[in-house]
Every structure is written in structure tokens, then in C-alpha cells.
Amino acid sequence: MLLEKLIRISKKVKDFKVNIAYSRCEKHVLTFACQEMGWQLTTKKGDGDIIWFIDGVKSDQIDMVRNLTYGHFNRYPKSYILCNKREFHILLNKYSNFFPDAFKFVPNTFVLPDDYVEFKDHFETHKDAILIAKPSKGRCGQGIFFWKEHQDLDQEKMKECLYIAQDYIPNPLLIDNKKFDFRLYFMICGVDKMEAYIAFEGMSRFCTEDYIPPKASNDNIDDEEREMMKMNGYSEDNLMSHLTNYSLNKTSLKFVNNNDFQQKDDGSKRLLSTVMKLMEERGVDIDKFKSDVKDICTKLAYAYRPHLVNNYHKVIGPSDEVNQNWFHIFGLDVMVDDDHKVWLLEINCFPSFDCRLDEIEIDPETKKKVKVK
């Protein structure tokens, strides 16, 4: 396995090196991880046992990668395509056609405007349907809104900004009457022989408003918060009751920055391990929760594999010497409903490990743990 291989190499090689020349803002957390592992850092071009890219392998770096048969690389070629919500759900929908029961951890999803007819039929047959719409290339919760009843799509707007629309999960598991989700990290290794790993330490992100079903009134946002939401492109719905995004909830006067997160469990961001204990107290089978998350990661790895293998051989070539030396860390956003079912909300192909601008202590602490583990 790649991790065991890296550990064996690092023990045999006196100066096991990680090249941070291409890592930009992530070099700080890499420096910490190398200190913990006893590894060396280098910025020399073409040098290192691990070459860390922030974005991916660029065209002028391909020859270097091909020639470094001993190097290990953290970005699969053209993996950025999978970051697009639209492309991701088109991929999963194709698999669901062949394996209808395999991907039931994903809410029913419409890719718009392509699925307009199915989208319209859904509202006609499900009168109480509530869908949550997300821009295909959106981030930080921007541009998200709810569809509570059928309304014709603005076809021109859809062409400018493609959307996905998903069945809203109306029964989230609540802690302190707040909705929450998890950001976990999993890693795919190798090309022709693929392996997957998951780190069961991550972050749990809480809404700052008590949960209110989407049909309820949203009058509990004060004028200052509503104006801030408008400035950042958020809809009029009280998204602070529904979206856990830090970029949204940090603007709330109710945001709790708990720097003593190792001892207390009342912050708007908490450790995954802390929240799992609270879930267990509420009757959630944590072993099953972990098993369900592993099942999601396994199926995502299988779904991604043809794309990753195909683009690897197109860009790098059929080199058996180096194709097992590639790995990629993904950010996985999941939530649990009050029936204890685990749902996949989103996957991030380029989760940030930048610790420079983190405003609360739990962020760099969690990112460092993920890098080391």
C-alpha cells in the first residue's frame, strides 16, 4: 500500500524529502507535518520523494513528473473536472442508471437545465417538494436558494450559471436544536491498482440559527445579518438555519468561537470526534456511521477510477513505474438525518489546507492532524 510504502522509504532514506516549491499557501501545514514525521523540506525543482502541487500538474511540469520514477505526487491529472457539481452529478447519475441501489446516499438530484422536464414532473407529482438549488461552480454557500413550489426556470439565467437542484433533507439530526454536517477527508492512491483511506478526524460545522423547516418564516434574521447576506450573494431565506458554511455563519452574532474545543463541545465548529460522542449519546451507532462513510468513499473511488485512469494515461502515459505513486486528498461533506442515515452533500476535489487565514483555532489544528495521519 502507498502509505506503508512511503513509511518504509522514509525509514530507509536518510533525508526523506517533501518538495513544497509548488505548494504555495499549503506550505505552512506541510512544514508542520514534516516536522512531526521527521521528514525534510526542499524547494529544489525536480527534487523530493513527495512533490506537493496546490492545483495540479501543469503542462510545463509533465516531463519532470515522467522522469521522477521514485517521486510521489498529490494531484491526479485533470482531477479538477470532478470539482464541478454538475459534472460530478452527471457522473453519479450514469452509475445510478446501472446500479440504482448503490448511490442512495445522494439526495435525488436534477442537473439544470438538462433535466428540466424531469424537474417539472417532480413538482407536479410531489406537491410538497422542497428542493435546494446550487450553482454548478458555486462555493462558500453563495447563490443557493430553495424551490418550495414549481416555478418556471429562467432558461437564459440557467445558461449563464448552470445549477443542480436536490431534494432537501427535511429531517436532519439536531444537536442543541442546530443542524450540522461533517467535513471529512479521504484519499485515493495509485492508478491501475487503486486504494482508498479515510481520516476519521475532521470538523463538524453547525448552523448558528435553530433549525426551522424551509416553509417556516425566516423573520429571525436581523437587518444587519440580512444586509450582510445580500452583500455576499445569499438568498433571502434564512440560510443560517439550513447551511453550515463557515463563510455564511461567521457573519452571525450568534457564531460561537470556542478556542477550548478540546475540552468543550459548544462551538459553531467542533471536532468530528467530539460530535460523534454526542451522537452516540443520542442513540447513533457510531460503528455503523463509520461503516456507511467508508461505503460512500469506496463507491466514489470506483466511480472516479475510469476518469482518473483515462486522464492519467492521456497526460502522463502508460508508465507502470510511476502510476502507483499518485495520490489525491478529497474533502467529503456528509450529514446525518434523524433516522441516522448518512447523506453525501458534496465532495471537494481541492480542499483547502491553508492555515494562514484561519480565524479560529480548530481549523489549523484539524488540518495538521489530517496531514500527519
Question: Where do the model's predicted regions map?
Answer:
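Short, flexible/disordered secondary-structure transition segments
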Residues: 41-45, 70, 99-103, 304-315, ...
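Conserved N-proximal alpha/beta basic substrate-recognition cap immediately N-terminal to
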Residues: 3-130, 137-139, 149, 175
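Catalytic core of tubulin tyrosine ligase-like
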Residues: 118, 122-332, 336-343, 348, ...
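A short acidic/small-residue loop/turn micro-motif
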Residues: 350-352
